[in-house]
Each structure stands twice: as structure tokens, then as C-alpha cells.
Swiss-Prot record:
Gene that this polypeptide is encoded by: yidC
Protein name: Membrane protein insertase YidC
NCBIfam families: PRK01318.1-1, PRK01318.1-3, yidC_nterm, yidC_oxa1_cterm
Gene Ontology process terms (BP): protein insertion into membrane; protein transport
Principal place of residence: membrane
Protein function: Required for the insertion and/or proper folding and/or complex formation of integral membrane proteins into the membrane. Involved in integration of membrane proteins that insert both dependently and independently of the Sec translocase complex, as well as at least some lipoproteins. Aids folding of multispanning membrane proteins.
CDD domains, A to Z: 5TM_YidC_Alb3, EcYidC-like_peri
Organism the protein comes from: Salmonella dublin (strain CT_02021853)
Length: 548
């Protein structure tokens, strides 16, 4: 096997991967979801079944911090709009990215409140509470590190319910604190709940381009418990009324999309019920209902939960709740993508540029793999040295394929040559390549991250296709510098067009990935020359390329 045949192996790996991805998209399986169904029920579920109310109409108040711009409905205290000022909707745009939305075209809300037997949000107790607020606009002032937004409601019996949103500077985690003052003569039984609801179908203005040439990031629901660290739950599964029903201490529920997430994190000192629901009209929900709390007459009870609404910043999410950082979608190669990202982030802390960080990590990866690369070229050189013997054997045995195979294997054994030795490094490199792809598509830090010159977003394709062309040029040079034993005319034609085919493949790949491949090819050229010099000394390589 020689370097040019390696290109065929890479091409086959690419084609196989894309066929697999297309099949996955049609079948759309999620291994985590299959595990989930073992712990769920398929009984028809709804928010009402959980004692969770529907939305209502109230007055809208606004809350602005340095990182959040929210709109809260005083009817129930739901967050109906969420803008993220630090993240533009598009590269170069002054319009902030909108995560939560309540419009005729699309619904995505974070609901919360107090349900249970005596909770004001229990549908059996009438309409949702209409909270009173002291003003309609709250702003985190300069020099202020915390902003509280209290909302109060008094029921017909005179009991007072206070719901307070607590915001902190630079934080996407919002604490929601409840105070229940029982002025009656009987205990009040209440339960906190948190629910995320969203339209299943995306309108055009919500399409974030979460798929990129065969690789698709996950959009749907997820949850975590101490027993199940991270489980995805597809919107289609919820829409089909295959509903989640899990009880657990601790954990969280979330809705995910590329780069951003919302999540409710209840307190972990009581049992919480996690559920999903098909709300109808193309809207699905995931939520939690906490264990009931009794507030005795004349007493005041306190409860709390936390809402995450923002980008999937892994270290910050991990500090909010265990395993919340797993919401970053690195696909089935997460076990490679996660350490790769940690290394990349560490390098970035020194160089300050994600593009240069990718270049450095490429050198590190190729340096670690150098022994395998050297073994690959040595194996290919030995295979070339055996070609005259193999050709003579084929001429001697004619059409006896069985004898040919037997004697060829005996020859390999005698000469201590592994015919698959040239493939092994490629098999190792391919998962790293794909893991880097998932990392670029799933890490918020690389969204709109510039490199240099015309590359302003490493997670997007090169707008001028310069990098893919350069990648094709490097492949052409590798091909021309590599000895070949290919004699079949058809294979020779395929080899000739391989750099062109790969250039077309890479036109739609993220710039960061193409940059990685260019640098990797340049390293290959350097390593190839160093290895060939060593092989020449051993008589396994000639500096003059053999002609086919």
C-alpha cells in the first residue's frame, strides 16, 4: 500500500461516513433516547396532568443586565423573551441573538411558579396569578453586581406569594426564589415547577444553520439525574406522546440547540418529577415538579430553583449543576472532542487566537502520531520492495486466486510485512478529524471566532474558498512526492482527480477544519521527507520517484 492508495482509503472513509450520516438523519436515532425509553412511560401526558398551567396574558416587564435582556409576563411570571447582547445574531450584525421568543410564528418560553394543592399556578385554583411589580423596567446599573426583581401576589384567602428573580453580573444563571406567607388557619401545600416549552417546527428566522455538510447538531430536550448523567429526548418523541416520567433527587431538565441552551435546575434536597408533554398546536415541553412543601399557619416558607438561559459555556455550566456542561453537543465522538477542546482552550489562553490555537494543536497531534506515521511509511516501503516478487508470483500462478492469496500471505509473513500497516494511522486520524469537526460545530467559543485576513468565523465555511483550494494544492504535492505502485489505469485516473474531489468536499467545511487539514498536510510533507531519508539509508526507498 502506498500514499496514493491512502487517498483512496480516506475517500472511502469520507463517503462511508456521509452515507452513515444520511442514514442516521433519516432514521434519526439517539442512543440516549433509546436508553431513556426504558425509564419512561408512553401514557398520554400533558402539562395539566402535572398540575402545570398554560400561559396567560399579563403585563410585560423588561430586565436588562450586562449579558441578558429578558421580557417577563406578570401573568405567572414566565420568561417569554430572551436576548443575548454579547452574541450577535449573525457575524457583523448589531442585532443580538434571540433565544426565547413569543410570537405568532414561534414559541419558546421558560415557565415557572408554584403548583401543588394550594399553589396559585395550579389550574384547579383558577387562572394563573397576576403578579404586582413596583416598576416595568429593571436595569443592572454600572457598579451593581446583583439585581432583584420581586413580584408579589395575594390570593383570595390573604396568603402572599412572592416570586423573586435574582440576576448577577456576567451570569446566565438566574435564581428564582419563592416566599409563601400563610396567613390562614390551615397548612398550605405547594410545589415549585419549571417548564420549558417550544414549537417543534423552526420558522426561517430561527434557522441557525445547525447542520453543516452531513454533520448535524442536536436540537431537542434533555435531562440529567444522578443515575443518568445526560439523556437526550427528541422533540418528535414528545410529539408522539412517548412521555418522560422520572423521579429523582437533583438533576436538571433542558432544551438544546447549537451553541445555546435553557435549563431548569431544581433544588436537590427533595424528590423532583421530570416529565415531557405534548401541549398541542406543534408545541412540546419538558419540565420538573418538585416535592410538595407544607407551610404551616402563621409561617413563611421559602423555595428556590435556577434557570440557565444563554450560551453553552462549559465551565460556567458545570459550576451551576453537575453534568450541565454535557449539553454541548459533541456527537458520538464526545470522548475525543472534549479533551481536544480543553487542550485547544488551554493553548488559546496563551496565544489569544483560535486559528493559531488550531495550528498548534495540529502540530501536537501530528507529533504524537509521528511514530505511527513512520511505521506507516516503513510498511509502505516494504510493500513496494515486495512488488517484483508479488508480480512474479501472479504471473506464475495465473488465475489461481486461492494459491495467490496463500502464497502472498506466506510472503508477508516471511518478510515480516503487515499489509494493513499503512492503513492503521489513517484509521486513527479519521476520528480525530471528525472530533475536531464536532468541536467546531458545538463550542460556543468558536462561534464567530476570527483567525486572520479574510477568515472572520472559523466555524463557518471560507467565503472565498481559498482555504479549500490551498488544501487541494497540498494534497497534490503530497501525491506527486509519493512513490506509487499503482499500475491500473482506472486507479491512476482516480488518483489524478483525488485532490480535486477533496477540494470540492471541503468547500462547505468550517474554515477551522480546513485550516487543520492544510497544516496537517504540510506536516505530512515535512515528515515524509524526513522518513524517506531514513528509509534511503536502509535501502527501502529511492530518492527518484518510481514511475508506474
Amino acid at each position: 500500500m502506498d500514499s496514493q492508495r491512502n487517498l483512496l482509503v480516506i475517500a472511502l472513509l469520507f463517503v462511508s461516513f456521509m452515507i452513515w450520516q444520511a442514514w442516521e438523519q433519516d432514521k434519526n436515532p439517539q442512543p440516549q433516547t433509546q436508553q431513556t425509553t426504558q425509564t419512561t412511560t408512553t401514557a398520554a401526558g400533558s402539562a395539566a396532568d402535572q398540575g402545570v398551567p398554560a400561559s396567560g396574558q399579563g403585563k410585560m416587564i423588561t430586565v436588562k443586565t450586562d449579558v441578558l435582556d429578558l421580557t417577563i409576563n406578570t401573568r405567572g411570571g414566565d420568561v417569554e423573551q430572551a436576548l443575548l447582547p454579547a452574541y450577535p445574531k449573525e457575524l457583523g450584525s448589531n442585532e443580538p441573538f434571540q433565544l426565547l421568543e413569543t410570537t405568532p410564528q414561534f414559541i419558546y418560553q421558560a415557565q415557572s411558579g408554584l403548583t401543588g394543592r394550594d399553589g396559585p399556578d395550579n389550574p384547579a385554583n383558577g387562572p394563573r396569578p397576576l403578579y404586582n411589580v413596583e416598576k416595568e423596567a429593571f436595569v443592572l446599573a454600572d457598579g451593581q453586581n446583583e439585581l432583584q426583581v420581586p413580584m408579589t401576589y395575594t390570593d383570595a384567602a390573604g396568603n402572599t406569594f412572592t416570586k423573586t428573580f435574582v440576576f448577577k453580573r456576567g451570569d446566565y444563571a438566574v435564581n428564582v426564589n419563592y416566599s409563601v406567607q400563610n396567613t390562614g388557619e390551615k397548612p398550605l401545600e405547594v410545589s415549585t415547577f419549571g417548564q420549558l416549552k417550544q414549537s417543534v417546527n423552526l420558522p426561517p428566522h430561527r434557522d441557525t444553520g445547525s447542520s453543516n455538510f452531513a454533520l448535524h447538531t442536536f436540537r431537542g430536550a434533555a435531562y440529567s439525574t444522578p443515575d443518568e448523567k445526560y439523556e437526550k429526548y427528541k422533540f418528535d418523541t414528545i410529539a408522539d406522546n412517548e412521555n418522560l416520567n422520572v423521579s429523582s433527587k437533583g438533576g436538571w431538565v433542558a432544551m438544546l440547540q447549537q451553541y445555546f441552551a435553557t435549563a431548569w435546575i431544581p433544588r436537590n434536597d427533595g424528590t423532583n418529577n421530570f416529565y415531557t408533554a405534548n401541549l398541542g398546536n406543534g408545541i412540546v415541553a419538558i419540565g420538573y415538579k418538585a416535592q410538595p412543601v407544607l407551610v404551616q399557619p402563621g409561617q413563611t416558607g421559602a423555595m428556590t430553583s435556577t434557570l440557565w438561559v444563554g450560551p453553552e459555556i462549559q465551565d460556567k455550566m458545570a459550576a451551576v449543576a453537575p453534568h450541565l456542561d454535557l449539553t454541548v453537543d459533541y456527537g458520538w465522538l464526545w470522548f475525543i472532542s472534549q479533551p481536544l477542546f480543553k487542550l485547544l482552550k488551554w493553548i488559546h489562553s496563551f496565544v489569544g487566537n483560535w486559528g493559531f490555537s488550531i495550528i498548534i494543536i495540529t502540530f501536537i497531534v501530528r507529533g504524537i502520531m509521528y511514530p505511527l506515521t513512520k511505521a506507516q511509511y516503513t510498511s509502505m516501503a516494504k510493500m513496494r520492495m515486495l512488488q517484483p516478487k508479488i508480480q512474479a508470483m501472479r504471473e506464475r500462478l495465473g488465475d489461481d486466486k486461492q494459491r495467490q492469496s496463500q502464497e502472498m500471505m506466506a510472503l508477508y509473513k516471511a518478510e515480516k510485512v503487515n499489509p494493513l500497516g499503512g492503513c492503521f494511522p489513517l484509521i486513527i486520524q479519521m476520528p480525530i478529524f471528525l472530533a475536531l469537526y464536532y468541536m467546531l460545530m458545538g463550542s460556543i467559543e468558536l462561534r464567530h471566532a476570527p483567525f486572520a485576513l479574510w477568515i472572520h468565523d472559523l466555524s463557518a465555511q471560507d467565503p472565498y474558498y481559498i482555504l479549500p483550494i490551498l488544501m487541494g494544492v497540498t494534497m497534490f504535492f503530497i501525491q506527486k512526492m509519493s512513490p506509487t505502485t499503482v499500475t491500473d489505469p482506472m486507479q491512476q485516473k482516480i488518483m489524478t482527480f483525488m485532490p480535486v474531489i477533496f477540494t470540492v468536499f471541503f468547500l462547505w467545511f468550517p474554515s477551522g477544519l480546513v485550516l487543520y487539514y492544510i497544516v496537517s498536510n504540510l506536516v505530512t510533507i515535512i515528515q515524509q521527507q524526513l522518513i524517506y531519508r531514513g528509509l534511503e539509508k536502509r535501502g527501502l526507498h529511492s530518492s527518484e520517484k518510481k514511475k508506474s
